[in-house]
C-alpha cells in the first residue's frame, strides 16, 4: 500500500489489489495450494489491464477468507499466478544476483551468467538445490509458454536470464549446485539379506517421520546410502531405531555437489583436494558427496 500511495502522489494512476481477495487457496496455511479455477475467475474479472496494478506477494485466502501463505518463494509464485491468469506476455522477477548463474560465486570464482535456459533446465536445477527460481513459479508459466526474466535490482540494466521454451541441447555449459552441511548415511543388512522395496519403504517412512530431507539415493543388493539434510538435528534420535535392523555408518558435515551437463574438467574441479565418499552418474547429471581432507 505504501508503494501504491507513493505512485499516486507522484501522479501515476494505479489500482491497489489486496492479493488475498484474488488468490484463493485451500486451508494449508503455510504452504497453500491454489484453487486455479476460482483464482482465474477472480483475477480476470477485477484486474484492469490498462492500468498499473499493484499487489503484494506470498499471500492468499481460503474459502472462509482466512489468510494463507504460499510457501517458499511465494512472492515470485504470485507473479507466476497472475501472469497465468492474465495470459501475460512475460514475467520479470528481481533478485540480488545478475540472473541465473551456472554456479554460486561464493564457491566458484569463474561462475558465469546463463543468458537463456529452458523451463525444464530451470526446474531440474531448482530440484537439485538452486535457489534463484522455485519450481512453483515456473510451472504455471511453462503451461502457457510465458517467458520469465530474472534480473538484478542492484544493476537493473544488466540483461539477466531468460527462462523460456527451448531445446535443452542449446545450453551444455556445466552447472554446479552445492549443498553444504549434509549427512551421509549408509545402511547395510546385518545378516547379508537383500535390501528390498519393503525395507526401503520403511526407511523412507522413518526419514519422513524424523524430518530428514533426502537429496541423493544409492543402493546395492545389501546396502543403501542416502545423503540427507538434517535441519532439525533429529538423526541422533533416529539412529538407534535404524540400528535395530541395519548396520549404520554415517558421515556428518559433508557436501553434496550436483553437476548438470558434467564433463571431466567439471568433475575434477569438484573433487580437487577433497575425499570423495560417494559418486552417482546419470545421462545429464553427476552427484558427488565429498568431505574436506
Please annotate each region the language model reported.
Residues 159-293:
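A conserved regulatory-domain signal marking ACT and ACT-like small-molecule sensing domains
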Residues 12, 146, 212:
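Short phosphate-binding/catalytic loops that engage adenosine nucleotides
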Residues 24, 61-63, 100-101, 156-159, ...:
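Flexible loop/turn segments at secondary-structure boundaries
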Residues 116-164, 170-172, 180-182:
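A conserved active-site cap/scaffold subdomain adjacent to cofactor or substrate pockets
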Residues 1-133, 138, 291:
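Nucleotide/pyrophosphate-binding catalytic subdomain
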Residues 90-94, 148-150, 215:
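Short hydrophobic alpha-helical runs that function as membrane-insertion/retention elements
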Residues 47-62, 125-149, 186-200, 251-270:
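Electropositive, surface-exposed helix/loop patches at the edges of structured domains
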Amino acid at each position: 500500500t505504501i508503494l501504491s500511495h507513493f505512485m499516486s502522489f507522484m501522479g501515476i494512476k494505479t489500482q491497489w489489489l489486496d492479493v488475498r481477495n484474488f488468490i484463493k487457496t485451500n486451508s494449508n496455511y503455510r504452504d497453500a495450494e491454489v484453487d486455479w479455477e476460482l483464482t482465474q475467475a477472480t483475477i480476470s474479472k477485477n484486474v484492469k489491464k490498462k492500468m498499473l496494478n499493484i499487489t503484494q506477494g506470498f499471500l492468499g485466502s481460503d474459502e472462509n477468507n482466512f489468510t494463507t501463505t504460499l510457501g517458499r518463494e511465494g512472492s515470485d509464485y504470485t507473479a507466476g499466478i497472475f501472469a497465468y491468469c492474465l495470459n501475460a506476455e512475460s514475467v520479470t522477477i528481481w533478485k540480488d544476483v545478475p540472473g541465473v548463474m551456472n554456479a554460486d560465486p561464493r564457491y566458484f570464482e569463474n561462475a558465469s551468467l546463463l543468458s537463456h535456459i529452458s523451463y525444464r533446465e530451470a526446474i531440474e536445477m531448482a530440484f537439485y538445490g538452486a535457489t534463484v527460481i522455485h519450481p512453483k513459479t515456473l510451472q504455471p508459466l511453462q503451461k502457457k509458454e510465458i517467458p520469465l526474466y530474472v534480473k538484478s535490482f542492484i544493476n537493473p540494466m544488466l540483461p539477466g536470464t531468460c527462462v523460456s521454451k527451448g531445446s535443452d541441447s542449446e545450453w551444455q555449459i556445466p552447472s554446479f549446485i552445492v549443498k553444504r552441511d549434509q549427512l551421509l548415511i549408509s545402511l547395510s543388512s546385518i545378516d547379508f539379506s537383500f535390501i528390498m522395496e519393503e525395507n526401503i519403504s520403511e526407511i523412507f517412512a522413518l526419514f519422513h517421520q524424523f524430518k530428514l530431507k533426502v537429496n541423493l539415493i544409492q543402493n546395492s543388493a545389501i546396502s543403501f546410502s542416502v545423503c540427507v539434510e538434517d535441519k532439525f538435528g533429529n538423526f541422533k534420535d533416529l539412529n538407534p531405531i535404524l540400528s535395530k535392523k541395519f548396520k549404520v555408518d554415517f558421515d556428518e558435515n559433508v557436501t553434496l555437489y550436483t553437476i548438470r551437463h558434467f564433463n571431466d574438467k567439471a568433475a575434477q574441479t569438484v573433487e580437487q583436494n577433497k575425499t570423495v565418499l560417494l559418486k552417482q552418474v546419470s545421462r545429464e547429471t553427476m552427484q558427488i558427496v565429498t568431505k574436506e581432507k
